[in-house]
Amino acid sequence: DVLELKQSHPEYFEANKGIKRNEGADFGIGQKLYKRAKKLIPGGNMLLSKRPDMFLPDQWPSYFSKAKGCKVWDLDGNEYIDMSIMGIGTNILGYGHPEVDDAVRKVVEQGNMSTFNCPEEVYLAERLIEIHPWADMVRLARTGGEANAISIRIARAATGKDKVAFCGYHGWHDWYLSANLGDDSTLDGHLLPGLEPKGVPQNLKGTMLPFNYNKIEELEAIVANHDIGVIKMEVSRNVEPKDGFLEGVRKIATDNNIVLIFDECTSGFRQTFGGLHKKYGVSPDMAVFSKALGNGYAISAVIGIQEVMEATQSTFISSTFWTERIGPTAALKTLEVMEREKSWERITATGKDIGKRWQVLAEKYMLPIEISGLPALVNFNIPVDNWLKYKTLITQEMLKKGFLASNSVYVCTEHINAIIDKYFEHLDSVFETISDCEDGRNVDDLLDGPVCHAGFKRLN
């Protein structure tokens, strides 16, 4: 056979040594599948934040076959520890939590959908109000983007006003992207610079007015010069609120009969049991939750005061799959486990430890570093010209060591000390290499493929 021939007459094969292998010969199943996906799916996948170009172009495994705890297996069977974004923040309790999955399996066996409503939607509404006593009513959906859109529809219906003052990222819908109509730089600090709102009706122009986080004077000016009906913002993302900032926002809303909405899709249940606003003692008129609420299962919620929420009845907000049973069932069990294990305390402590150890590592190799974000959503930045190349190098080298890693860690309860120690053991050598590159070594010679794309930019 061929192998025997090669062993007995190696000279026959010498000519092949100079032949370059076909493009993709070294690609795994995931990389090849993504090439097919780009021909079939606009953008290649369903979520910008999961595109391989955001991590490691041409090298990222892209697809998973299994996920458990804080581990992920790709289509080639390779096992990785996820020290990255954990499903984009969906799994505080880790992937495939047994109690949550068992609860879901039970309702799948009993039936997920029927002509009747599922009782779990009532139980979940009661639970969310119990956790947030300021709220009176609840509407459920299945994604954060649609829950944010629902909250805006309800608030506009309640106030009879179109204009929204906003800060931060709130999804892909027309109401939000309309901020870029006429001036495509408006969202530069919130979304991707240069975002074009094609497909968004032009008559929405002027309905969205952005302000920077911790800049109360900007919000005051907007309210003074426009007939604002809604203030929409994240409680916190990358920096802490200045003393009096959230209280000032609340006062402006109250004094001007404006509905205040806190978007807790990302921040919820990470530093408190419930919305992050509980930490600061400032209650909104409405709050929006998603991501961690179902530990990987699709569920979102809009909670609010009765005076505002009853405006839902004056408009039309309705969807068939908001009545399925898996989402609220998963949420109820997730909340039960979170409360019992005090998950928010654990992931906050772990995140603070990771941030401190990044700082120590940077100091060891005399690298500048900026650490930001909620403790459980901690991230770092090395503010130098080659940062995107270094970020790519981190992902590339850590992937070889069996880690999904970049410059952000969305912490889960499965990130135990032994895993964190192993992560830093391997990250040490990458920081050393970055230090060498800052001293003159050529980082381009170390990269096996293209540089990763820049991520989101926001005004908070």
Protein language model features and the residues they cover:
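PLP-dependent enzyme catalytic core of the Aspartate aminotransferase-like
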Residues: 1-12, 339-341, 349, 400-460
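Active-site-adjacent loop/helix segments that line or gate small-molecule/cofactor pockets in enzymes
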Residues: 9, 15-66
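Structural signature of PLP-dependent enzymes
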Residues: 334-359
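PLP-dependent aspartate aminotransferase-fold enzymes
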Residues: 123-230
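Glycine-rich loop-to-alpha-helix module at the N-terminal edge of alpha/beta enzyme cores
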Residues: 79-161
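Active-site core of PLP-dependent enzymes with the aminotransferase class I/II
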Residues: 215-221, 233-259
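Active-site PLP attachment segment
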Residues: 280-312, 323-330
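Conserved PLP-binding catalytic core of the aspartate aminotransferase-like
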Residues: 352-355, 362-395, 445-460
